[in-house]
Curated annotation (Swiss-Prot):
Lineage: Bacteria, Pseudomonadati, Chlamydiota, Chlamydiia, Chlamydiales
Gene name for this UniProt entry: rnpA
Enzyme Commission no: 3.1.26.5
Entry similarity comment: Belongs to the RnpA family.
Biological processes annotated in GO: tRNA 5'-leader removal
Protein name: Ribonuclease P protein component
HAMAP family: RNase_P
Major enzyme class: hydrolase
Length: 139
């Protein structure tokens, strides 16, 4: 059984990481969200970053969006391939939790396979994290 928290090493935190993922990664659209997905250099490591602008709504609406995206990622991250994901809302409507779970399981593997199966090298420059390691968590 896995922990029911999302550790700090499973999050995208720095601006340069967000920029790398958006430039080097592939983009796919779910039913309510937009995913930017880039392969991870560390096997068994899946990271999540969330961006929500003020145009989406007031703070309570933005925080609700972030909470349900984090929870959907937490539930599905052990079944996802090694990747780095940035999630953005597609429109101003609150996404449904079930749709997010479905998007995480279907859209992200498709995005990784479509862009990176032909060309294994990263596109848009190299991101070299300093002292950043991601270990797969033990059950």
């Amino acid at each position: 059984m896995y922990r029911s928290t999302l550790p700090k090493r499973a999050r995208v935190l720095k601006r340069r990481q967000f920029l790398y993922i958006s430039r080097a990664g592939s983009r796919c659209q779910g039913s309510q969200v937009i995913f930017h997905v880039a392969p991870s250099k560390y096997p068994g490591c899946c990271k999540l970053g969330i961006t929500v602008s003020k145009k989406f709504g007031k703070a309570n609406k933005r925080n609700y969006f972030k909470r349900i995206v984090r929870e959907a990622f937490r539930l599905k991250r052990h079944s996802l391939p090694s990747c780095q994901i940035v999630v953005m809302p597609k429109n101003k409507h609150r996404p449904k939790f079930e749709e997010l779970l479905q998007d995480f399981t279907q859209q992200i593997p498709e995005a990784l396979n479509s862009k990176f199966s032909k060309n294994k090298s990263t596109i848009g420059g190299e991101y070299s994290p300093k002292n950043e390691q991601c270990e797969s968590e033990l059950p």
